[in-house]
Amino acid sequence: MVAFSDKQEALVNGAYEAFKANIPKYSVVFYTTILEKAPAAKNLFSFLANGVDATNPKLTGHAEKLFGLVRDSAAQLRASGGVVADAALGAVHSQKAVNDAQFVVVKEALVKTLKEAVGDKWSDELGTAVELAYDELAAAIKKAY
């Protein structure tokens, strides 16, 4: 069980709303960061075959889904102290052989993107809340393998 406060959930929700304010822009930031840190990740995402394109609905849709899952993770943590991931999500990550290092790269890209999205509203408290929500989501996905 993880203690997650109402304030932490609100911080994560606010960051998600900032991301949603310009999904194409922040999707590009997110995937560009991933590819800078781990160029081989291009092979994990079929929609990156032609590079990072803000007009690609699969790119923006996947980013929105991931950021939404982190927001949902925060809600689950506040409500129950744990996160449960859909079995299909675990199966996809297992099939793609996503490893711990790749989860770390995604977390770093997520944090960088949200930091840019919220601008001067970024704080250590927000960063901690986002990282905790993501870490618990990643653990739940791995458990669902």
UniProtKB/Swiss-Prot annotation:
Main location: cytoplasm
A GO term for molecular function: metal ion binding
Domain Globin as annotated: residue spans: 3-145
Pfam families: Globin
Residue positions where Phosphoserine is found in the record: 46
Annotated positions of the Nitrated tyrosine modification: 26, 31, 134
Compartments where located: Cytoplasm, Cytosol; Nucleus
Keywords attached to this entry: Cytoplasm, Heme, Iron, Metal-binding, Nitration, Nitrogen fixation, Nodulation, Nucleus, Oxygen transport, Phosphoprotein, Transport
Tissue occurrence: Root nodules.
UniProt keyword Nucleus present: yes
Classification via Gene3D superfamilies: Globins
Record's GO cellular component terms: cytosol; nucleus
Residues that coordinate or bind heme b: 46, 65, 93, 96
A GO biological-process term: nodulation
Function: Leghemoglobin that reversibly binds oxygen O(2) through a pentacoordinated heme iron. In root nodules, facilitates the diffusion of oxygen to the bacteroids while preventing the bacterial nitrogenase from being inactivated by buffering dioxygen, nitric oxide and carbon monoxide, and promoting the formation of reactive oxygen species (ROS, e.g. H(2)O(2)). This role is essential for symbiotic nitrogen fixation (SNF).
Description of how the protein assembles with itself and partners: Monomer.
Xref: PANTHER family: LEGHEMOGLOBIN-RELATED (PTHR22924), NON-SYMBIOTIC HEMOGLOBIN 2 (PTHR22924:SF92)
Family to which this protein belongs: Belongs to the plant globin family.
Descriptive protein name: Leghemoglobin-1
